[in-house]
Regions:
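The feature captures the beta-strand-to-loop junction immediately N-terminal to the Walker
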Residues: 35-37
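Conserved ABC transporter NBD signature motif
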Residues: 58-73
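Conserved small/polar residues in nucleotide/adenosyl-binding loops
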Residues: 140-143
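ABC-family P-loop ATPase nucleotide-binding domains
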Residues: 81-137
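Short coil-to-beta microelement around the adenine-binding A-loop and adjacent beta1/P-loop entry
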Residues: 16-17, 71
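Helix-to-loop junction immediately C-terminal to a conserved catalytic motif
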Residues: 50
Length: 143
């Protein structure tokens, strides 16, 4: 089953076309990497796939449904940027309130148990963690 389908996806910033008719099928259970030189559109493509950006042309489907402005589909997609400055000042335990508001199925006890199992002190700020620890904490809520 195709979980991600891109059909002739194009995206420009002003007059500069960044994505040039991308076509891609990702099958359920497969693993893929996205590599390329700086500025070639990797982050733009990921942000289009996750529905953060809208493509200018083409179609992006997650499990057969359009992703942009589709909360039902976005609830199935998780994304944590390589650098996530938005949450740096938060303590891990403060993230609980944020997660409760953003994710209806968020389980506070499971989140605390998870952080304890990987040795994270929930009183620490995100910026006090290693990059891997911070990503683990932020990825926890990915569907």
């Amino acid at each position: 089953m195709k979980v991600i389908e891109l059909k002739d996806v194009k995206k420009s910033y002003g007059k500069q076309e960044i994505l040039h008719g991308i076509n891609l099928d990702v099958e359920e259970g497969s693993i893929h990497g996205l590599v390329g030189r700086n500025g070639c559109g990797k982050t733009t493509l990921i942000k289009c796939i996750t529905g953060i950006y809208e493509q200018d042309q083409g179609q992006i489907l997650i499990c057969g449904e359009e992703v942009f402005e589709n909360p039902k589909v976005k609830a199935k997609v998780g994304y944590v940027a390589d650098s996530n400055q938005y949450f740096d000042g938060y303590h891990i335990d403060e993230m609980i309130e944020f997660y409760k508001q953003m994710y209806p199925t968020f389980e506070e006890k499971a989140f605390k148990d998870y952080n304890q199992s990987i040795g994270l002190d929930v009183s620490k700020r995100i910026r006090e963690l290693s990059k891997g620890q911070a990503m683990s904490c932020l990825l926890y809520t990915s569907p």
